[in-house]
């Protein structure tokens, strides 16, 4: 007998009226998600498992007390074992004009070529910080939650480095768009 996924009493499947689900196929979900603009980030790590980085838009704040953000990482990604072992990362939010760097870190380019394409500093956690990023969040991974194909990495922020560039970069409708800070 299958247990009801909604009912905390573990009654048989179909017992709860709230169980009605709207099944959304993968393509419909992806098309809908393309309507949500998001900052473009390069996530980096360095530690016992080595140096790695990837492009991500699935990044957001969780709380400011303590300062925490989350990063979603596919467990099937080639970089997953490196991040999983190192347990530190830096979220480097890209500026307008860094689209080619985003594409480089989003592809199958070898790691040494990815990192050779930009200038980096070392953050307090030892992770690479992109010198020309809009902002960099240097973090320790405090918790990992698995959902479907991805791990949600909860990241305790240890340091923040802001840069002077006035232009941000977002991913919207499957393409890059530059944003400019309003004049004060």
Curated annotation (Swiss-Prot):
InterPro entries from the UniProt entry: Flavin_Rdtase-like_dom (IPR002563), NADH-dep_flavin_reductase (IPR050268), RutF (IPR019917), Split_barrel_FMN-bd (IPR012349)
One GO process term, biological-process aspect: nitrogen utilization
EC number(s) stated in the UniProt entry for this protein: 1.5.1.42
Catalysed reactions, semicolon-separated: FMNH2 + NAD(+) = FMN + NADH + 2 H(+)
Keyword flag Oxidoreductase: yes
Pfam families: Flavin_Reduct
Keyword Flavoprotein: yes
Molecular function per GO: FMN binding; FMN reductase (NADH) activity; FMN reductase [NAD(P)H] activity; riboflavin reductase (NADPH) activity
SUPFAM superfamilies per UniProt: FMN-binding split barrel (SSF50475)
Membrane-spanning intervals of the chain: none
UniProt keyword list: Flavoprotein, FMN, NAD, Oxidoreductase
EC category: oxidoreductase
Inducers of expression: Up-regulated by the nitrogen regulatory protein C (NtrC also called GlnG) and repressed by RutR.
HAMAP family named among the record's database cross-references: RutF (MF_00833)
Primary role: Catalyzes the reduction of FMN to FMNH2 which is used to reduce pyrimidine by RutA via the Rut pathway.
PANTHER family, alphabetized: FLAVIN REDUCTASE, FMN REDUCTASE (NADH) RUTF
Family: Belongs to the non-flavoprotein flavin reductase family. RutF subfamily.
Descriptive protein name: FMN reductase (NADH) RutF
Organism: Escherichia coli O6:H1 (strain CFT073 / ATCC 700928 / UPEC)
